[in-house]
Structures are given as structure tokens and as C-alpha cells.
Amino acid sequence: WIESIQLTKGTGSVVNGFESIAGQINVELKKPESAEKLLGNIYVNDQGKTDLNLNVATKLNEKWATALLLHDNFMNNALDMNMDGFKDMPTGNTFSLVNRYKYDNSNGVLAQFGVKVLNDQKVGGETSFNENSDKYTQNRYGLAINTQRYELFGKLGYVFPQQKFKSIGLQFNASDYQQASYFGLTNYNANQQSFFTNLIYQSIINSTIHKFRTGFSFQYDKYNEDYNLNSYVRKEIVPGTFFEYTYTPNDQWSLVAGIRGDNNNIYGSFITPRLNIRYEPVIGTVFRLSAGKGQRTANIFAENNSLFVSQRSLMIMGQNNSGAYSLNPEISWNKGISLDQKFNVFNNPATLSLDY
């Protein structure tokens, strides 16, 4: 499925939002116009784990292309190699699907949209655990996490034919996430409905040395969580605007400075500034400097499911049933510097990276 992975250290670009704190990971899936027409593989090991993959891609005509990516894996054997009475790994099944369509009229109009589906079911605990008779009892310990996620995404862009440096684009993403789980006597169920859209305009100031991107974004999240007998419901609505300036006088220097302003219906208005500088004095030696701010709302239960296994009770002190668990958002100021040096070792390329 994966064509490439890009890793960005530091706070990243304001165009992508305000939440990035330590870095960003962008995973590029195989594209409809360049993926294999047909690719399938099957993996089975002696422990019973089975993986099935099928990729199908085709060009429908000169303007349209589509790709279908399918994956299914299952593990039904309750392994207990160390004979402690507990499964060494969960049993269950995972199915995922991605279907993408891409449009290019060769005259500046580009479009892409698709769907993603995930259905994941996992059961762990004692090897003798039976969901039908032992669930929510002290007979035998067991846990299960059942997850369903559905996503619709798309991009629409226009590049001005006579001014290739100028473009306008719209991104959107809508998803529904549901989790039903239990960990021994602990119960946790969650539902998240999200919508995100980003309108981006890109152009130059006098010359391509001075580029800028600006636009508007809108984020909507609705959370409904049940932890044992407690319910946590919240809705976050965050409209925002941003401006980013890029200065590239030559191949050695580049500077990206950005600022965005957002308004969260729970936490109010806030500003997010960011700066990234790159300097390459000689080919193969690159210095990078970054600084900026990030802010996010922590989903304390969903991000710490592993704590439920211990059967400890999680208590939020001073609850007033408002906002996100009555807690403040996470806010971080991040700054760093790095050096990347490329060289050869026995005629093979290598890279040394130093970060602070």
C-alpha cells in the first residue's frame, strides 16, 4: 500500500494546522495512475497468522484513474509459548479498504477523492477465556477491542495554465470512528465524528523567490465516550486562517515563516507562529533550524487504552462536566537545530544526522 513516507521534525507548516508539536508524518499510498495494475500476495506462518493483500489499479480513460487496495489478516490460534495461561498476542481479524479516484484534465484542473474502511476485532486475556460466559465476570480475565472506522476524503485544485506558480485548492475529510471495548470489568466505548476542510491559495510576490500560501480551515469534532458509569460528551468547532511566506534566494538558503489564528469554541482564540530555516553551504551538508508553537486537545482515554488492562480506576479530579474533561489544552513551544551530512562508506551512500 505504501509508496513513501515523509518525516518532518519540529512544528511543521501552519498550512497543515495548529496541532503539530514534535513533528509530522505523511504516508503516501500508491497512486491510481502509477500503481501496479494487479498485485496480490498471501502470507501464512506456522503459528496461524495469515495476511491477504490485493491491489488493483486502472486508467478508466485519459482523465480518470482509480485504485482499490484491500487487506485482511486474521489470527485464530491462542498462542501461549511461555505457558503462563495468557495469550501471547490477541486473536481476531482486521479488514481494511482504500478506494481512490483521480482526475486530471491536463489543463490545470486536478481532483482526487476516495473512501477508507477499517474493521478491527481483537480478543486477549487468558487462553481459557470465553466471551459468551466470562465477559464482565471474575471467572477468567479477558479483553476485547472492536473498532470500525469510515472515512471520505477529497482534494480539488486548479493550477493557472499561464501562471504555474499560482494555484488554489480545497481539501476535505469526513470520518466516523466507533470503538466498543472492555478490559476485565472495565468498560470503555467511544464514538468520534469529524470533519475537516482546508482552502489554500498559493502565489508569488514579484518573483518566485518570494512565495506565499494563505487560506482558511475548519475543524469539527464530536466525541461521545463512556468509561464505566461516566459519560464524557464534547463538541469542538475550530475555524481558522493562516498565512505562510517562503523565501528561496538560491539553492543554499530557504526560509519558511508562517502564522495562523484559530478560534476554539471551548478554549477561545489563539495564535500559532512557526519558523523553519534551511541552509546548505555545500552539497551534502544541510543545517536546519525550526521554532514554533503547537496546541492540541488530549483525548486522555483513547490515547491511554493500555492503562485499562491494569484494572486501575482513572479519576479526573475537579470535574465540572464542561470542555474536554475539564482540562486545559496541551500547549508546546518547540525549537531545535539539526545537521545532516551525506557521505559514502565503501561506495555506498550514508547519512549522519545530529539533532538538538
Where are these regions (language model features)?
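Surface-exposed extracellular loop regions of Gram-negative outer-membrane beta-barrel proteins
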Residues: 63-82, 92-94, 98, 132, 167-176, 265-267, 279, 283-335, ...
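Membrane-embedded beta-barrel scaffold of Gram-negative outer-membrane proteins
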Residues: 167-181, 280, 288, 325-356
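Transmembrane beta-strands of outer-membrane beta-barrel pores
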Residues: 42-46, 72-76, 103, 117-121, ...
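Short acidic/polar hinge/loop motifs at secondary-structure boundaries
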Residues: 1-9, 97
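N-terminal periplasmic accessory domains that precede
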Residues: 6-7, 15-41, 52-55
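Flexible loop and strand-edge segments within Gram-negative outer membrane beta-barrel domains
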Residues: 75-96, 102-168, 174-192
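Repeated loop/turn-to-beta-strand initiation elements of outer-membrane beta-barrel proteins
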Residues: 36-37, 63-66, 76, 107-111, ...
